[in-house]
Curated annotation (Swiss-Prot):
This is 2-oxoglutarate and iron-dependent oxygenase domain-containing protein CP2. Residues 17-35 have a biased composition (Polar residues). The keyword Nucleus applies. The gene is CP2. It is found in: Nucleus, Nucleoplasm.
Length: 394
């Protein structure tokens, strides 16, 4: 079967790829490791504020391994009752953790605890090769032009470094070659440790059989900083319609393609609001990303329109940023070995709002066409009504 035929067959049914480095279907906010556990005796009758106290400056939680993403604690702190705002950090953590755990079904709590134990086994036994990777140093990670655009933090500065070769697909140079090399070496070191210890690791998602979850071996804090300080400002400008301004959790991982690895990736959508995909390198042939339009859940398997077709060729250090609901896949890597780092960025606010909406025409290509066609029909009907010819009497 040719690559074109294979791609055509893949487009008949679009898969939603789930992945938190956990059991499929796990809540996206329950995947982070735990060092502090809230007990059932900690239940408080105090209620959260209905509106955030935006004048309050939250504590930093970046130095801790917690039940939920560090950024969730910083965001939730603004909703704490007044007497809790003046409490010490440990008391606030216990209070917030208990609230969030109480809203998890019992099965989810058990899965979260098992995954916490799994991560703890890794972080207490795995010895990092490049410890500098675990704290985000912008000048070490990013190319100067990208840093300059982030520091200026305007739409104009972003557009100066970003191209949009197809609607909703944004491409820009991002990572330093030296950083990519360190990441590749760290991944090799992790896989070597896995092989030597025969430790069974969880794969990134439900489609990739190879690769690793970066959050599981200690890079979650670094990736949180990457999302909050560098991806969210860009997403606020280009993906405001899918919660780009309110990204508050992530799933970070690497995937590997080539000989003795995954070969290609079928047509799918991601479990994210915004996806960052960066090629880390190694020599390879093939592996192009093919994009086929953004769709809501209702229209995920509808036909692709001519202007929605785009193929992207990977370049080491170059980033691709797109909506998670942008349908895509990866063609076969026919030679060599390709490694990509992905960050699925999620917004709990957008996910909650989405449950109350049916019109996604601002980002779903099919919803947009349906709304446009309905508008045309309404105008035609009104025109016929207003300009209905008068009947002459005999």
């Amino acid at each position: 079967m040719s690559s074109e035929q294979r791609e055509g067959s893949q487009e008949t049914t679009t898969t939603t790829v789930e992945g938190n480095g956990t059991i499929a279907g796990q809540n996206s906010h329950s995947a982070a490791p735990t060092t502090l556990r809230a007990t059932s005796t900690m239940v408080s009758c105090q209620r959260l504020r209905l509106n955030p106290n935006n004048e309050h400056r939250p504590d930093s939680y970046e130095d801790l391994q917690l039940d939920f993403p560090n950024s969730v604690y910083s965001s939730l702190e603004k909703y704490l009752p007044p007497n809790m705002l003046v409490s010490n950090r440990d008391e606030k953590i216990k209070f917030m953790t208990d609230i969030m755990l109480r809203h998890l079904p019992h099965g989810e709590r058990s899965r979260a605890q098992r995954h916490s134990d799994y991560r703890l086994k890794i972080t207490t036994n795995y010895q990092p090769l490049h410890k500098e990777l675990y704290t985000l140093v912008p000048t070490v990670c990013f190319v100067p032009a990208f840093l300059k655009a982030i520091n200026e933090n305007t739409e104009e500065s972003f557009r100066n470094i970003i191209s949009e070769p197809s609607p909703g697909v944004f491409v820009f140079d991002m990572l330093q070659p030296s950083f990519c090399e360190m990441m590749l070496a760290e991944i090799d070191n992790f896989e070597r440790w896995v092989g030597e210890t025969k430790f069974r690791i969880m794969r990134p998602n439900t489609m990739n059989k190879y690769g690793a979850v970066l959050d599981d071996f200690g890079l979650d804090t670094m990736l949180d900083k990457l999302m909050e300080g560098f991806i969210r400002p860009i997403s606020k400008v280009f993906f405001s319609d899918v919660g780009g301004a309110t990204l508050d959790s992530h799933h970070g991982f690497v995937v590997e393609y080539g000989k003795d690895r995954d070969v290609d990736l079928g047509f799918h959508v991601d479990d994210s609001e915004v996806t960052l995909n960066v090629c880390l390198g190694n020599q390879f042939v093939g592996g192009e990303l093919f994009f086929r339009g953004t769709r809501c859940e209702k229209h995920v398997n509808t036909a692709t329109k001519a202007d929605e077709t785009y193929d992207y060729c990977h370049i080491p250090g170059q980033a691709v940023l797109h909506r998670g609901r942008h349908r895509h896949g990866a063609r076969a890597t026919t030679c060599g070995h390709r490694v990509n780092m992905l960050l699925w960025c999620r917004s709990s606010v957008f996910r909650e709002l989405k449950t109350h909406h049916k019109d996604f025409s601002s980002w779903c290509g099919e919803c947009f066409c349906e709304k446009r066609d309905e508008k045309v029909r309404s105008i035609d009907a009104l025109r016929k009504k207003l300009f209905k010819p008068r009947q002459t009497q005999a």
